[in-house]
Amino acid sequence: MKEFPKNYNFIESEKKWQKIWQEKQIYAYDENIAKDETFVVDTPPPTVSGQLHIGHVYSYTQTDFIVRFQRMMGKNIFYPMGFDDNGLPTERLVEKQRQVKAYNMGREELINICNEVVASEEEKFRSLFNQIALSVDWNLEYQTISPLSRKISQMSFLDLVKKGEVYRNNQPILWDPVDGTALAQADIEDKEKTSFMNYITFKTEANDEFTIATTRPELLPACVAVFYHPDDKRYQHLAGKFAVTPLFNVKVPLLADPLVQQDKGTGLVMCCTFGDQTDITWWKTHNLPLNTIITKKGTIDFPHEIGIDGLKIKEARAKIIDILKEQELFVKQEEITQTVKCAERSGAPLEVLTVPQWFVKTISHKDELLKRANELNWHPKNMKIRLDNWINAISWDWCISRQRYFGVPFPVWYSKRIGEEGKILYADISQLPVDPLKDLPIGYSKYEVEPDLDVMDTWATSSVSPQLSTWGISDEFAVNKDRHGKLFPMDLRPQAHEIIRTWAFYTILKAHLHQNTLPWKNIMVSGWCLAEDRSKMSKSKGNVLVPEKLLEQYGSDVIRYWSANSKLGADTAYSEDVMKNGKRLVNKLWNAAKFVSQHFDKLSDEDKKTNLIDVKEKITHEFDQWIINKLVELVNNATNELQNYEYANAMHLTEKFFWSVFCDNYLEISKTRAYDEENKNPSGQYSSVLTLYHVMQTLLKLFAPFMPHITEELYQILYSENSIHIKGNWINYGNLNYKIDAKQPERLLEILDHVRKFKAEKNLSIKAEVQLLEVSGIELSKELTSDLKNVTSAKEVKFKPTNDEIKVSILT
């Protein structure tokens, strides 16, 4: 055993061990070990455009608890770290940091700047993840924009093309006019906004007036029909007739459709191409003409004497209303609250435009995906309903093309050869990764093709995050077929609950389409980290906690302790009180270890090296045997909780045992025997010290997944020069159990509680001498009575046998 330092300096210790773990490759994956002995993690690649905050620490450490446990259980761990550095989020970061606009820059210039920025941001993440002791193997690091990732992402696309699961079509899509790109259904959020319902006068061909209500009068030039509900008796007389639009005098059909809400507005609604998804449905169902007036920039494209051409949406709306009023065609306006579909990132209200895009078939697979969700092991189980609800709500195929620059390009060109104009040309697998702006399809010159200018949705690459690590998509499309087969499907996907509808869903979809399987066996879903007042952290509120400051103040182990105190999947508020409890626990571990260590030289070197099971006969004292039984019970329960991903329960059980059973009671009761200054009870002393030795060692191992630095420091001082975190270093006591009457030691604790309470009430020191301790009830054994005398400082203990509950009288 090394000399025990006077104090614990967490800053020095944490830096020291982080360096040693890296140098000694404690967390390295061994590719030569069989698949069934390996635990494979699909680590969330953080979006490097995001601000580093305490939420990163919160969620990533919860994964690390499970990984460290699995490693100590003997598993070969595949625990990579990736960085999601491609796509629109990175472009927006660059625009903000460099005060530029992507559409004002050359494509190549923007890409170069993006690469510079992400390299800098990734280094910040690496530093933080090392500081909080994530036990990842950094040799497995990947970036979603790297050549290898681009190759695998393009393989995914080509595999889906070959399977007929991808198509390109010129159809209505959701468009963000601020970021200038198409979006998928999962990229939008519904926002409640104040708006106005405008009542406008229409006429029939016969000059009969009627009123429609709309929130978007600027779309009048795009009106292609007017609808009413077939059961609405007010308007059944309009069947087969035509309406004439105000201001523009365009004849449009009056049609019946069950999607009309009779109690909304007047029950008559105009269909424009396009205001919302209902317009798309009507356009398709009734084979209506396409009349597009909104541009990609969110302005009106409608040269007309009315003068709205080139105006922004809101400007055009105001002008149309003014003109309707002038011509006495405006009936009234009502303020309403409506749900508006907005872009999740820019926040802009979306438009529906008809622009050619790439799509992954999704709607046709909804039933299959619901079955996949059932096959998956959810931790916690109640998170599954979120995926079920999302799948049931899907109404669009997944649009995977984006009109941006910094992303994975489509391996696609369009032929300009005579006779095959517009033919889609795909790259050969041998060419990947390709940039169609620089590369050419086999057999074609640059004059014969037009490159696809779009890039893939960042989720199109993130959705194959398992495959980015396994280096393959399928048997046919793989960089390393053996590696892919060995690692896929994976064991665990950890992630936050708000991206179930995106990352979880898309990854399940891709694995299902590529290999007809789940991507992983288990999904572990974390909640949000909230501010102390339980509000969501945001820069605008000024309540975002910066991890670096907390690490300086408390250290990594304390922050990890706070994270471990949150139930899986629960939103948890940051708590100074919990942090202080964590600091107190670190100090108590140090002091408890320091206390027990002074006795370890009383043990033989052989017994120190021997497993508890093989020296169990040397633990002879009844109270020592009792705590060993309790310890075995703790190990079994904590192991079971960790195997079920309930790390918080495991932490709670271990901490409760450490404080209540070990520190408050066992140490106090057994320390007189451990000292045995008069050498009255050598066997009792040896039994006590051997018990202290193994209980402390076991507790360090139980705490190790949660608090890796303090446990490593103490373990190497007290027990071994090998890391506590090495593979196979978990505790296994098998069926170890001492045949004792557990009621006797527990009775001792109950009596001790009475004595402590008495002394506290009398303002006596806990060590104050007791002349006579008289106890009614069942008599304790000789061994336990001796312990009772020692811990209560009683000169004499008498028992009065009765069947009543314990009563204690004390004479001081």
From Swiss-Prot:
Catalyzes the attachment of valine to tRNA(Val). As ValRS can inadvertently accommodate and process structurally similar amino acids such as threonine, to avoid such errors, it has a 'posttransfer' editing activity that hydrolyzes mischarged Thr-tRNA(Val) in a tRNA-dependent manner. A motif ('KMSKS' region) lies at residues 536-540. This is Valine--tRNA ligase. PANTHER family: VALINE--TRNA LIGASE, CHLOROPLASTIC_MITOCHONDRIAL 2 (PTHR11946:SF93), VALYL-TRNA SYNTHETASES (PTHR11946). It comes from the Bacteria. ValRS has two distinct active sites: one for aminoacylation and one for editing. The misactivated threonine is translocated from the active site to the editing site. Keywords: Aminoacyl-tRNA synthetase, ATP-binding, Cytoplasm, Ligase, Nucleotide-binding, Protein biosynthesis. Monomer. One of its GO terms (molecular function) is ATP binding. One of its GO terms (biological process) is valyl-tRNA aminoacylation. It is found in: Cytoplasm. Belongs to the class-I aminoacyl-tRNA synthetase family. ValS type 2 subfamily. ATP binds at residue 539. It comes from Rickettsia bellii (strain OSU 85-389). It holds the Pfam family Anticodon_1. InterPro entries: aa-tRNA-synth_I_CS, aa-tRNA-synth_Ia, Anticodon_Ia_Val, M/V/L/I-tRNA-synth_anticd-bd, Rossmann-like_a/b/a_fold, tRNAsynth_Ia_anticodon-bd, Val/Leu/Ile-tRNA-synth_edit, Valine-tRNA_ligase_type_2. A motif ('HIGH' region) lies at residues 46-56. It catalyses: tRNA(Val) + L-valine + ATP = L-valyl-tRNA(Val) + AMP + diphosphate. GO terms for cellular component: cytosol. Its EC number is 6.1.1.9.
